[in-house]
From Swiss-Prot:
The keyword Nucleus does not apply. Its main location: cytoplasm. This is Ornithine carbamoyltransferase. SUPFAM superfamilies: Aspartate/ornithine carbamoyltransferase. The gene is arcB. Carbamoyl phosphate binds at S57, T58, R59, T60, Q84, R108, H135, P136, T137, Q138, C272, L273, R317. It is found in: Cytoplasm. InterPro entries: Asp/Orn_carbamoyltranf_P-bd, Asp/Orn_carbamoylTrfase, Asp/Orn_carbamoylTrfase_sf, Asp_carbamoyltransf_Asp/Orn-bd, Orn/put_carbamltrans, OTCase_ArgI. HAMAP family: OTCase. Pathway: Amino-acid degradation; L-arginine degradation via ADI pathway; carbamoyl phosphate from L-arginine: step 2/2. Belongs to the aspartate/ornithine carbamoyltransferase superfamily. OTCase family. PANTHER family: ORNITHINE CARBAMOYLTRANSFERASE, CATABOLIC, ORNITHINE CARBAMOYLTRANSFERASE, MITOCHONDRIAL.
């Protein structure tokens, strides 16, 4: 299996087979175990990794940096003020230059087309750290966390609550149905997923036996839920939409009433973070002052409850990103897992 990843880009979930995606999850679990036991796993010894960031980041930057160092590579951060993608230099030219200097390239930004161009012209593996359309490294962490809690993925029901047309919702739908996970999107009709994304997921669901539900009805959405998942109500670049999103998405908040509707004591709660569950941030205070809402997509009660697994999920970003880099770029002594 290892050989099928060598030299490949990691740009979107739809580019991989079920077996490949599940292998990366299992490989990440193996690397996590090595990390916990203090066993070196320097599959990228002597490699140089470029980390390109148009968008700000805490978890993605920290995960790629620590993962690269653990693997023996040198990570070099290039922020929005350091790169000229499409401004003073075309993406194609930038890709060709960076590909001569680095062994692998991570990109976190707005345009999916841009990361695809990097992948087309760099000549080295390119990894999507997030775009407006897809968030594939997050999915590996999410579904690793699910598997750690339930021992399997096939047949699990995951309910995403909130903005059903953002990158996380897109990726949850496609990655989940690819692996046999039932995915429910609980969202207002105005924010239902794009039809093309749903059709793509339906194709995967037909192969895997997964079930898809897109609804604005809470009772329908959480019926049979094993996982409740939410994300911020306003994505990066949409800050002018705060007022309308708060009004529109308040009924889709993950709170204890919604948890109780699921009627599953083994249920877990996931969030890709950051979460606006209180007013202990400048952002949270500002929203509370302007709109009278002290808790947004998830209540503080749920966020701190026994159901919460989001900090495990955040840690798993590092282990899964490590798996992607090692599999696509690593020296070929990766064990079978």
């Amino acid at each position: 299996m290892t050989q099928v990843f060598q030299g490949r880009n990691f740009l979107a979930e739809k580019d991989f087979t079920r077996e490949e995606f599940e292998y990366l999850i299992d490989f990440a679990a193996h690397l996590k175990d090595l990390k916990k036991r203090g066993v070196p796993h320097r599959y990228l010894e002597g490699k140089n990794i470029a980390l390109l960031f148009e968008k700000t980041s805490t978890r993605t930057r920290a995960a790629f940096t620590t993962a690269a160092i653990d693997l023996g590579a040198h990570p070099e951060y290039l922020g929005a003020n350091d790169i000229q993608l499409g401004k003073k230099e075309s993406t194609e030219d930038t890709a060709k230059v960076l590909g001569r200097m680095f062994d692998g390239i991570e990109f976190r930004g707005f345009s999916q087309r841009m990361v695809e161009e990097l992948g087309e012209f760099a000549g080295v593996p390119v990894w999507n750290g997030l775009t407006d359309e897809w968030h594939p490294t997050q999915m590996l962490a999410d579904y690793l966390t699910v598997k750690e809690n339930f021992g399997k993925l096939e047949g699990i029901t995951l309910v995403y609550c909130g903005d059903g047309r953002n990158n996380v919702a897109n990726s949850l739908l496609v990655a989940g149905t690819l692996m046999g996970v039932n995915v429910h999107i609980f969202s207002p009709k105005e924010l239902f997923p794009d039809e093309e994304i749903v059709k793509l997921a339906e194709g995967f669901a037909k192969e895997s036996g997964a079930h898809i539900l897109v609804t604005d009805n809470a009772d329908e959405a959480v019926k049979g839920a094993d996982v409740l998942y939410t994300d911020v109500w306003v994505s990066m670049g949409e800050e002018d939409k705060f007022k309308e999103r708060v009004e529109l998405l308040q009924p889709y908040q993950v709170n204890m009433d919604l948890v109780k509707k699921a009627n599953n004591e083994n249920l877990i709660f996931l969030h890709c973070l950051p979460a606006f569950h209180d007013t202990n941030t400048v952002y949270g205070k500002d929203v509370a002052d302007k709109y009278g809402v002290s808790e947004m997509e998830v209540t503080d009660e749920v966020f701190r409850s026994k159901y919460a697994r989001h900090f495990d999920q955040a840690e798993n970003r590092m282990h899964t990103i490590k798996a992607v880099m090692a599999a696509t770029l690593g020296n070929l002594f990766i064990p079978k897992v």
